[in-house]
Swiss-Prot record:
This is Probable lipid kinase YegS. SMART domains: DAGKc. PROSITE patterns: DAGK (PS50146). Residues 2-133 form the DAGKc domain. SUPFAM superfamilies: NAD kinase/diacylglycerol kinase-like (SSF111331). The active site is at E271. Probably phosphorylates lipids; the in vivo substrate is unknown. GO terms for molecular function: ATP binding; lipid kinase activity; magnesium ion binding. It comes from Salmonella schwarzengrund (strain CVM19633).
Length: 299
């Protein structure tokens, strides 16, 4: 692999003492691969390190962390307007790793790192909310958002993605739907929503396939609504076959407008955003990402 250009790894501070990762990086460096490593400590670090990556002339910026880290790095990359931006590499080190998992990124660190450095760079979409906040994986609203933001860190560290489901079961007494109206291209719905998923990617909340047909290079966002008419069936339908389920509403559009009579909160790759009005739009081909050739998220 000695002929591959330099890369810069932006590593979430929680993974700074990951010994297997240190060993994998050392082995690649011994093969002649140049890998710069930077560790995030506070919000804004990813943007600063992407700026540094451009000054260093690297061709790949690797996001080492969970969905939140991938979001920060990818958002910084799409801000580049002059010249060709570095490609995005994925190194899943978070609690759930929903985007990386659905994209087929290997769990083994050495294999994921090699893919992040040497994989083919494919153009993929991102999404933007209210002309400001971006997400690469999914925007989720409703009960699911409350669960992912409230799940204790110790529970996530111990159980990983399944911690979200367990915490959800513990909070069944708080199940309340959000009344809202959603419009898109050839789509209109209004009613009580228990969970709303608007996906560029397919899964969120620790492996729940909220938007199972989503693709990251089709110029569309997938919508799935779990209505509040039957709360328990809607909650568990992500674990079962959803065909002909009257509690599930699906849609696809390049944009969605959401209006609620009261404040609701969306979780954008782990970052909460509250309000009553949301305009969510796809950004086609917003960045290049190094993905496996059989990535299930590509058409």
């Amino acid at each position: 692999m000695a002929n591959f250009p330099a890369s810069l790894l932006i590593l979430n501070g929680k993974s700074a003492d990951n010994q297997p990762l240190r060993e994998a990086i050392t082995l690649l460096r011994d093969e002649g691969i140049q890998i710069h490593v930077r560790v995030t400590w506070e919000k804004g670090d990813a943007q600063r390190y992407v700026d540094e990556a451009r000054r260093l002339g690297v061709e790949t910026v690797i996001a080492g962390g969970g969905d939140g880290t991938i979001n920060e790095v990818s958002t910084a990359l799409i801000q580049i307007r002059d010249g060709v931006a570095p490609a995005l590499g994925l190194l899943p080190l978070g609690t759930a790793n929903d985007f990386a998992t659905s994209a087929g990124i290997p769990e083994a660190l050495d294999k994921a790192l090699k893919l992040a450095i040497a994989g083919n760079a494919m153009e993929i979409d991102m999404a933007r909310v209210n002309d400001k906040t971006c997400f690469i994986n999914m925007a989720t609203g409703g009960f699911g958002t409350r669960i992912t933001t409230e799940t204790p860190e110790k529970l996530k560290a111990a159980l990983g993605g399944v911690s979200y489901l367990i915490h959800g079961l513990m909070r069944m007494d708080t199940l309340t739907p959000d009344r809202c109206e959603i419009r898109g291209e050839n789509f209109h719905w209004q009613g009580d929503a228990l969970v709303i998923g608007i996906g560029n990617g397919r899964q969120a909340g620790g492996g729940q396939q909220l938007c199972p047909t989503a693709l990251i290079n089709d110029g569309l966002l997938q919508l799935r609504i779990f209505t509040g008419e039957e709360l328990l069936p809607a909650l568990f339908s992500t674990l079962t076959q959803s065909d002909d389920n009257p509690n599930i509403i699906d849609g696809a559009s390049a944009w969605f407008d959401i209006h609620a009579p009261h404040e609701i909160t969306f979780n954008l790759d782990g970052e909460p955003l509250s309000g009553q009005e949301f305009h969510i739009e796809v950004l086609p081909g917003a960045l290049r990402c190094r993905l496996p050739p059989d990535c299930p998220l590509l058409r």
